[in-house]
Amino acid sequence: MKKQNTFLRLAVPVLLCGIIVVGCRLSGSRSGFTREERRILFEQDSILYVTVVTDPSDSLILRTPCADLSDKMLKSKDFRLFSEKLKATVQAPWEDGVGIAAPQVGISRRVICVQRFDKEGEPFEVYPNIRIDSLFGAVTLSTEGCLSVPDLRGYVPRREGAVISYTDPETLTRVSETVRDFTAVIFQHECDHLDGILYTDRADSVFFSERSAAERMYYDSLGYYVKPSVLIR
């Protein structure tokens, strides 16, 4: 999910996360991740390519319901790497998001990364096997954008609160939590991705954002949105 307010910026030097991969064997499956999923993780830099609806093969991924991760996967080094790369990707200046879901980087697993505006320091956190158990409160119109839907914004009806549950990757136990306000909106937006739903499916109206389009055009001219060969099918 894109930030609500974005501004065209000059080029910003980016200090990428220092993720160094040495001697990876992509043919192995000890982690539980598939060979294709591991290629996506290991054959790209710290910041992953984000799938977009304007690309036919990307759109198929975005519309595919996601599978849970096994306990084996959650305890693997591959999952830790995946988590770090999700955090790095959503915070990249040319993405500038507040949330991202696994299918947005080409991996159909129930994992999202959300910025917790309701916590001190507003950290980005990763939630595997996430579910929204219930929604509550009034329905309000949220102005939303999406990393995978370039140049557009929409007015989307969302509930003001949500009860979520997810698997703690350390203890492998289910955790339940209540979120409200803008944080709840982000969770609703990202969890929709895991079921193949885009905000445009729920929006009362969608409109072209000149600011978003100008920003994307600028970063596109610098080569930040080139699709890597590992995702070309």
Locate each region found by the language model:
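Positively charged
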Residues: 23-233
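Bacterial N-terminal signal peptides that target proteins for export
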Residues: 2-12
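Bacterial N-terminal signal peptides
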Residues: 11-21
